[in-house]
Amino acid sequence: MKEQGGAGCRFCIRGTLGILEGAKRDGEDIKVYLPLPIEYAQVKNVKIHSVRIGEREAEAQEYTIARPDAFQRTICFHTKHRKGQKYSVEFSFENREAYKDFSHGSLEHGGPERIKERTGANGFAEPMDAWLAQQPPHIRFTPLIRELASDIVGEEKDPLKKARRIYDYITTHVMYSFVRSYFTLTDIVQYAASSLKGDCGVQALLFITLCRAAGIPARWQAGLYTTPLEISCHDWAQFYTASHGWRYADCSFGGAAFREGETEGWDFYFGNLDPFRLPAAREFGYEFEPPMDHLRNDPYDNQTGEAEYRDRSLAQEEYSTEYEMISLEDITY
């Protein structure tokens, strides 16, 4: 990727959600949501190839596909549930990632070549104030966050170097740790800043909040980590500078590289991202389109799907979600 100046992949993936035995209700109205890639930033050419309910192709009136640039993009099935019936969608997309050297050595010599990138998630100029604002209850500039951001950034004025200092702090001080459901944490960022531990999403939110507190626009990006070996849930962040537009920060991957003594990998995940990503959420805690009628199992992210009957939503242990890699090919960056 470094030698080529970037990398690209074309994916074809099938997502399937099934209702487990104790939650099956034959003949009842059901809504089922599965994540889809958002067509923005690094993702292009999203195509839906198949939508199936049970053993048949779904009718057009039985599902709704959210707009391509939705904050959290899904396909929503709305139909009658039958016992044993599963819900699946097969889609393809392209992910292209440009490589830039944001290592300490490069930054000390002025950083990589500047680029002109003024457009955001929808291909139009974004209101940068939105990416600098607080978003209670989790993205808040508490006294702890303000003081921590000030201590980390110090007298540095360059936005790129400020973001690198924040990334360095998180990747060298915050240990990766599984956490209980985000729904049970009253202030995720405060939890991370005080305990110095957290999973990929906790670390991404801490990075976003510290960046915003330091005057650097930053936002959420999350979905699936899609490699030839596995498809799993993952969260990361983006930050903006006038000189380089929107770039990436994967603090959990960067922190793992740092702890293993892999300086090249540590440097890579500041400003860069591998192409094995399916971004299905570009904001944290936003409603689906169309929204659910009841409380989501995961009200913040969009990774493992959701389901609800008319009277209630289904808990995590009442349904299962599977992803299958149909094909993965390298494409010219």
What are these regions (language model features)?
Residues 19-20, 77, 155, 196, ...:
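Generic recognition of flexible, low-complexity loop/linker segments
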Residues 159-166, 196-211:
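Active-site nucleophilic cysteine motif
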Residues 67-69, 76, 83-190, 194:
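Acidic low-complexity segments
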Residues 202-292:
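Hydrophobic/aromatic-rich core segments of domains that either
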Residues 95-97, 176-177, 197-200, 225-228, ...:
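Solvent-exposed loop/turn segments at secondary-structure junctions
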Residues 1-107:
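Intrinsically disordered, low-complexity N-terminal segments that are enriched in acidic
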Residues 271-333:
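Low-complexity, Gly/Ser/Thr/Pro-rich intrinsically disordered linker/tail segments
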Residues 32, 166, 237:
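Terminal peptide-recognition signature
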